[in-house]
Amino acid sequence: VMGKLTREAVVEQALEIGSAEGLQAVTIRRLAQELGVTPMALYWHFKNKEQLLIGMADHLIEGFVIAEDHARPWQEQLRELVTGLVRVLRHYPCAAAVLEEVDHMTVPNFLRVWDTALGLAKQAGFSYEENCLISKYLLQGAIALAAGPMSRRPSASSEERAECLRVKRATLQSLPPDVYPHIVEMAGPLIDGGTTELYDTFGVDILMTGIETMAARLRTG
């Protein structure tokens, strides 16, 4: 087994454990146990947990790295980047925690994505200062989207979740309609919220519309 152990296999196992149980459960000892190797075999790939977290972050971002393409509209490419980030954050519930733990400057794929985002915002006509703000807002916006009310919580069963939603919906519907007319009227969608896909797509639309509107103002101003 040790001969077959790859850096990628270690990282993927770490992401699985982190997503199911939280990052604190990701230890060299636990990983070695899950992978059927000795801790020393893992130190060959990662000398400590900090290096492992950097590897995890790099692997996460690898899934949506795109190179800046001047032949395609910048809006399309920026949307692709943000959508890719949200998709990765959704797939691995521990992803946001991993990205918060690491120094982004130590993660090669993060630097690639960051550089691409800055280049795309520059194409849109923003100043250097604005480019930097946009890249930060997009990262934080994607993290907030994926951590929002549609995020999956592995601890709750589907039955428990359905019952919890039913109680919340009934609570809102029982509010006095003369005081909270709109909450009572929209109690269903407020609690059910539609699909995760709709939630994420709408959220990315809001982020991108803000940037596109400001870029259009720059062109007309």
List each language-model region with its residue ranges.
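Amphipathic alpha-helical segments used for helix-helix packing
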Residues: 55-57, 86-106, 116, 147-154, ...
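A contiguous pocket-lining binding segment that forms or flanks enzyme active sites
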Residues: 116-170
